[in-house]
Design a protein with these regions (language model features):
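Bacterial N-terminal signal peptides that target proteins for export
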Residues: 1-11
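Cysteine-dependent hydrolase recognition
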Residues: 25-719
Length: 719
């Protein structure tokens, strides 16, 4: 089977294209990033610092209403307090597995929705705080468990778990429900508990979970049964008087099913609808579906109060027809007339949040006129110097190079919001370019904690991972970015340079340049073949290695075979490191593995990789094993990534799996990969793509194709 057409294009004239990288004196468009919901504020100096325009010019434009604001594809009205020099707007909550930030674009031009209408006048007589139907999402991401789902788009971070048949068969959780009140509010109060089945030990239904609201008070309860690795919602309706003023709890009980000794369920999140008093929390309150009539909100810390009718909409109204009075609890309350049922945002001005700002440089990634052989996707703030150095290096080889800054990808394909799907959609669009890229480089590490959860090593993940599904759950797969039609075969030669910093990435570019200009030596015709001892269940690893090594030998390479026999571990480790430090063009491994090792006995441990000093005599390393390419665990480096980012040695590129593989499929993939690399002299990215195409014909399952990915530059060749 021939390589996909887009991988066979020859370069045109060398060129370097920086997408969105041009210098500018001032910016007419800003990205504003918010977390949570509520009132946002930017003063003139903050806008000037972000945009490069002076405060007087921005003040003139704001007074003239010549700015527009959009979020989620919808125009949003804003309010400018000219006396204070502050721009206000309402932000809605946007939270996914990958981000807690919503994105807004503030730009000059034809206004889709300009400033809010302002309603002046006296307010109504003050009243008592009202009641409304609140909808809250309670969620804590405490632990990741991608093996618990089979849906690649599902959540894989969870709050907690219950486990029937163990001492952890019940769980009691506090419910943070501000100001609940008894009585009606026009809704049916209920809890929706989102659960994920995490075991499959029965041919019948595996799971049954009982939920009890306020179990010490004999509160309402409900149960649900479901199977295997399914997601399920436990629905618990209740009456308003079932909630206490504070201290509400939910108990979950994992109940044993007939014939099932143990069953595991994970808690994702809890959605709560209840009747809530109109009392601000932290100086703000978003009241949903209030009115008609007088609305009163208490609990505000001061007299400077904003009320926005229809917040976050193009028809939003800034209300000044208010009555403010003490609320009798050392705070203030505001009353206003609601002419119709609507949402209202009430906030003390001092409680407004300040959004993060970033210049929104123009980009044209959707244009069919684009042309590139080599496409770099990189986060500009973290990787600009390295991206431009890598681009210059490949442009010097005669390739047309384009950098697509990650935020530009989000701006054009996911409304500015962080989303792996935006990257996939962008690459689909790149297939329509005048010159379709052969190579795609993801410049930056990706982990399961791209959201930046504070207790799980935030800041490591620069480009989010995309998940694939296999027999043992979910696993990270850059192949699901580059395989745009879902057949398991990528349309591009893809690789990820798993650096966490610009400095680390620049060191890799220097390592790459030294490798590609290395002095000719015997190492360039050498392969190190490494094999685990045979496993009667998993595979004859030495036998598989011998067949593949014979193939590589027939292609003109000497083979230094290092096959572990189960004895003499220390000597084997020392000999392998010594051979590696002598240098080789190619290395391959057959056997058991983990994210941090080759061999169940750990004869090539992660801890040894930093000590390898074989640069520039660097191999392309293939790991026909399990997990060794999975660099997605927060706080832990993978063996493959460590080889690539070691500036003094290791490997120039690797091809290893991110999860558990089947030996037969791994061997088939490996044989094709080695033949294409050493025989056809393809680049590592091209060899990886074509190996998957050939393996699919050989009946290797598509999920196993998603496992293997390139760490390093996909345009690397054997010397």
């Amino acid at each position: 089977m021939s390589l996909p057409t887009v991988l066979r294009q020859a370069p045109l004239v060398a060129a370097l294209v920086l997408a969105g990288g041009q210098a500018h004196a001032a910016a007419d468009s800003l990205n504003l990033f918010t977390e949570g919901e509520g009132l946002q504020a930017l003063n003139l100096q903050e806008l000037a610092d972000a945009s490069g325009y002076d405060t007087a010019q921005i003040d003139t434009w704001l007074r003239g209403g010549t700015y527009a604001l959009r979020s989620g594809g919808t125009p949003r009205a804003w309010h400018y307090d000219a006396a204070a020099g502050i721009l206000y707007f309402a932000a809605e909550r946007h939270e996914t597995e990958h981000t807690a930030r919503n994105a807004h674009r503030l730009y000059r031009g034809v206004a889709d929705a300009g400033p809010m209408w302002v309603v002046q006048g006296p307010g109504p007589a003050t009243g008592s705080p009202g009641v409304f139907g609140e909808r809250l999402v309670l969620e804590e991401d405490q632990v990741y468990a991608p093996w618990s789902s089979r849906d690649p788009e599902a959540h894989y971070w969870f709050w907690d778990y219950v486990y029937a048949g163990t001492s952890k068969d019940r769980l009691r959780l506090p419910l943070a429900l501000p100001d609940p009140v008894a009585g009606g509010c026009g809704i049916q109060p209920r809890l929706r508990v989102h659960l994920q089945g995490s075991s499959d030990l029965s041919t019948d239904v595996d799971h049954q979970v009982l939920g009890i609201l306020n179990p010490d008070g004999n509160g309402p309860s409900a149960s649900v049964a479901f199977d295997a690795f399914a997601a399920q919602v436990l629905d618990i309706p209740f009456s308003s008087d079932a909630l206490a003023a504070s201290g509400n709890e939910l108990e979950l009980v994992s109940e044993p099913r007939p014939g099932v000794s143990r069953s595991l369920q994970r808690l994702d999140r809890i959605e709560v609808e209840y009747c809530r008093q109109m009392r601000a929390e932290d100086g703000q309150l978003w009241v949903r579906q209030a009115g008609p009539g007088v609305v009163t909100v208490a609990g505000l810390p001061g007299l400077e109060i904003a009320v926005i009718q229809d917040p976050g909409q193009p028809t939003a109204v800034w209300r000044k027809d208010l009555t403010v009075a003490p609320d009798g609890a050392e705070g203030y309350q505001v009353s206003f007339d609601a002419p119709a049922t609507a949402d209202y945002l009430i906030a003390h001005l001092g409680a407004a949040h300040t959004p993060a700002t970033e210049v929104d440089d123009p980009s044209d990634l959707t244009s069919a006129a684009n042309a590139a052989d080599y496409l770099i996707i990189a986060p500009k703030a973290e990787m600009q110097a390295a991206a431009e150095a890598l681009a210059a290096h490949r442009a010097a080889d005669g390739l047309i190079v384009k950098i697509a800054w990650l935020q530009d990808v989000y701006d054009e394909f996911s409304l500015g919001r962080t989303s792996p799907l935006a990257i996939r959609t962008f690459l689909e669009t790149a297939l329509t370019w005048n010159r379709v890229p052969t190579y795609v480089v993801f410049l930056g590490r990706g982990t399961l904690n791209h959201k930046g959860r504070p207790d799980h090593f935030p800041g490591e993940s620069l480009i989010p991972v995309r998940m694939a599904s296999g027999p043992w759950g979910l696993f990270p797969s850059d192949n699901r970015y580059c395989d745009t039609n879902g057949d398991g075969i990528p349309e591009f030669a893809c690789g990820r340079i798993p650096a966490e910093t610009d400095v680390e990435a620049l060191a890799y570019v220097e390592k790459l340049a030294a490798y590609e200009s290395a002095t000719i030596g015997d190492w360039m015709d050498l392969m190190i073949g490494v094999a685990d001892d045979a496993d009667p269940v998993s595979g004859d690893f030495p036998g598989d290695a011998a067949v593949s090594e014979a193939l590589v030998s027939s292609l003109g390479y000497s083979v230094n075979a290092r096959h572990f026999t189960g004895a003499g571990l220390t000597q084997f480790q020392d000999a392998l490191k010594a051979a590696w430090n002598q240098g080789a063009a190619l290395s391959a491994y057959w056997g058991h593995g983990g994210y941090d090792r080759w061999g169940a006995e750990n004869f090539l441990p992660l801890a040894d990789i930093a000590g390898l000093s074989n640069a520039p005599r660097l191999p392309i390393a293939a790991g026909l094993t399990c997990y060794a390419g999975n660099d997605s665990y927060p706080g832990f480096a993978a063996l493959a990534a460590a080889m690539v980012v070691n500036p003094d040695g290791g490997a120039i590129a690797t091809w290893m799996p991110t999860h558990q593989s089947l030996n037969a499929g791994a061997v088939t993939l490996g044989d094709h990969f080695l033949e294409l690399l050493a025989g056809d002299k393809l680049t590592v990215g091209e060899a990886a793509a074509e190996a998957k195409a050939r393996a699919l014909v050989d009946d290797v399952p598509a999920w196993e194709l998603d496992l293997f990915e390139v760490a390093g530059d996909p345009a690397v060749r054997l010397p």
